[in-house]
Amino acid sequence: MAHKKGVGSSRNGRDSDGQRLGCKKFGGELVKAGNIIYRQRGTQIHPGNNVGCGKDYTLFALIEGVVKFERLGRDRKKVSVYPS
């Protein structure tokens, strides 16, 4: 049994596809009810006024309006939707 792999073979060459996380609607943008605002793993950003949170922590608009990102104290952020 060879203790070296044959020439040309490699243990590299794999990479998984990205998960398309992040901000989908930015501050000041108009959204409709149900529009996804932010996709995340865990609550990097918390839901504020008129924003729902899915079981995978996706934040989505509950009403039609304008997106606004705000601070929750020193180290937390929230996103709200206000009627336009």
UniProtKB/Swiss-Prot annotation:
GO molecular function: structural constituent of ribosome
Annotated InterPro entries: Ribosomal_bL27 (IPR001684), Ribosomal_bL27_CS (IPR018261)
GO biological process assignments: translation
This protein's UniProt keywords: Ribonucleoprotein, Ribosomal protein
SUPFAM superfamilies documented for this protein: Ribosomal L27 protein-like
Pfam families listed in its UniProt record: Ribosomal_L27 (PF01016)
Annotated protein name in UniProt: Large ribosomal subunit protein bL27
